[in-house]
Structures are given as structure tokens and as C-alpha cells.
Amino acid sequence: HLISNGLDNLLIEPDDVYEYLGEKTLLVIVDTHRQSFLETPELFDKVDRIVVIDHHRKGAHFINNPIFQYHEPQSSSASELVTELIFYQTSKVNVSEQVANFLLSGICLDTKFFKSGVSGKTFEMAMNLKNYQASVEAVNEYFKEEYEEMKLISGIVNSAKVLSPGIFMATSDEEDIITRTALSKAAEEILSTKGVQAVFVVGRTNN
């Protein structure tokens, strides 16, 4: 979505990041608190100043001694936590409309468009993002599937098999490379089926 919206300058290839590292480098880890879950785990050992923002329940092998940690398992998403940090600053933080929409899309993805895992704070943060012109209509555009992605998701959904009553597993074809977003969409589609309590979706990603 960043690339398609002209914000590819916000992205950097993992192999290129090391030339920007210095004594004052701050590494902000979002949506996980485990080093093994990082996209580039080897970067972790190159930086001394680390911030962790996550909403998942704390598991084993969590990151020790960050200089700042906001870990709130009762929040709907990491996007909700980031939004909360933005809006509770003593001085106003400028947020562009596109960034506000990206944050809202994170909330929508993790809550299945406010159908599960929401709280009063979730709605409050979504309303705050609307002050920066974020909208569910824009988020829907982000989530529109391209044809090839739609085929991959459909294949995963059709592969679902019962492990035990209410518990399912679905897999992608071995040769397919699947984005994490596509895996999440497939899981959500299966979970929306009556009688499904949990689903495990397995696929090969770029990493």
C-alpha cells in the first residue's frame, strides 16, 4: 500500500539499513515483542536503543530492557497503540491523511472491521483518526484484492480441513509465495464461517 500510494520513500531494503546506523539510532519494534518474529532479527543486535509497541500476550523469549515499552494485550491492535501514543502527546503530532488511513486500516484488519476485540478506546482512537480525514471508505480501497491475490486466498480457504470439532487448518500451495496480509484475509474468511472457532493458516512468505 505504501508503494502504490507514492510513499515508497518510507521503505528501505533490509540490506541497505546498516549504512544508516549510528550511536543515536532508535529501533522501534511494532506488533511483536519477540526477537525471533522480527523481519530482520539480525538488526536487533546492531542497535542499543530499542522501543517495543505490541498488543500480543507476552510469551517466552521476549525482548529485554527496551528504553521504552508499551505492551497492552487488551488493545485491539498495534495501530491502536500507536494512535494512542500520538494523541496523548503534550504537543500536537502532525499526521497526514494517508498515514491516518494506514493506522485505521491496521485497526480494521485486527478487529475485522470492528466486529471483534474492540473496546471503547478502540472506537475513540478510530474517531481521533477521523479528525485527520481517515475513513473506512479509504480503508476498503486498500483491502480490495487484486485478481491474483484473490485466487491465492480462495485456494487457501478451499484447502481448509477439520483438525478437531471447530478447529481447522488451511494451507497454500508449496510453490506459492503468500503475503501475511493474504494469510490474514484467508483466516478471517474461514473464521466467518458458522461453527469455526479457530483456524491455523500456513503458507510460505518472502521471509
Roles of regions detected by a PLM:
Residues 6-66:
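Active-site cofactor/cluster-binding pocket
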Residues 11-15, 51-56, 74-79, 131-133, ...:
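Glycine-rich loops and low-complexity Gly/Arg-rich segments
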Residues 15-18, 38-42, 69-72, 92-93, ...:
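A generic local secondary-structure boundary/capping motif
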Residues 24-27, 48-50, 62-69, 84-92, ...:
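Low-complexity, flexible helical/coil segments
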Residues 55-126:
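Short alpha-helices
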